[in-house]
Amino acid sequence: MAELTTIARPYAKAAFDFAIEQDAVDSWAEMLTFAALVSENETMQPLLAGSLASTKLAALFISVCGEQVNVQGQNLIKVMAENGRLKVLPAVSQLFTEYRNEWAKEVEADVVSATELSSEQQQQISISLEKRLARKVKLNCSTDAALIAGVIIKTGDLVIDGSVRGKLSRLSDKLQS
C-alpha cells in the first residue's frame, strides 16, 4: 500500500493544485472518485493489468467514464495510462480527498458504537471533536454490539476508546501486570 501511495502522490498533488487553481476542488473530487470506481470494476481490472496499448487503454477508460470526466480529467487519465498507472487511481482519489480535507480544514471521524447513536449524540460528538481538533468534522457512524456499551472514535492518528470492551481490556492488562 505504501508503494501505491508513493506512486499516486504526484498525480494527486498535481490534480489538487490544478483543482485549486481552477476553483474546482469539489468537481475534481467527484471526478476522481468516479474514475477510481471505474478502475476497481471487475471488468476493467484485467484490461488495466493487460498489455493493451496505452492510447487504446486511455480511450477505452475515457469512453467508460463518459461525461463524468471533463477534458482536464481526461488528460490526467491519458498521462496515467501512458505511464501504466491507471491501477493507482483509487489511491490518487484517496490522497486527493485527504488534500481537500486538509485544505478545507475538515476531517473524517469513524465512530463505532454499541448501539445506534441518536442525532443529538452524533451532534455532541461532532461538536466535541471540532473543538478538540479545530476542524470541521464529518462522522462516519457504525455499530458493533461487541463493544458492549460506549463508543470508539478514530480520526487520523487519534483513537478515543470509550467502550466498555476497551475498559475491560485495559483493566485486564493492569491486573495481569
From Swiss-Prot:
SUPFAM superfamilies: N-terminal domain of the delta subunit of the F1F0-ATP synthase (SSF47928)
PROSITE patterns: ATPASE_DELTA (PS00389)
Coiled coil: none
MF-aspect GO terms: proton-transporting ATP synthase activity, rotational mechanism
Main location, first listed in the record: membrane
Stored Pfam families: OSCP (PF00213)
Keywords attached to this entry: ATP synthesis, Cell inner membrane, Cell membrane, CF(1), Hydrogen ion transport, Ion transport, Membrane, Transport
Subcellular location: Cell inner membrane
Record's keyword annotation contains rRNA processing: no
Assembly: F-type ATPases have 2 components, F(1) - the catalytic core - and F(0) - the membrane proton channel. F(1) has five subunits: alpha(3), beta(3), gamma(1), delta(1), epsilon(1). F(0) has three main subunits: a(1), b(2) and c(10-14). The alpha and beta chains form an alternating ring which encloses part of the gamma chain. F(1) is attached to F(0) by a central stalk formed by the gamma and epsilon chains, while a peripheral stalk is formed by the delta and b chains.
Function: F(1)F(0) ATP synthase produces ATP from ADP in the presence of a proton or sodium gradient. F-type ATPases consist of two structural domains, F(1) containing the extramembraneous catalytic core and F(0) containing the membrane proton channel, linked together by a central stalk and a peripheral stalk. During catalysis, ATP synthesis in the catalytic domain of F(1) is coupled via a rotary mechanism of the central stalk subunits to proton translocation.
Similarity annotation: Belongs to the ATPase delta chain family.
Name of this protein: ATP synthase subunit delta
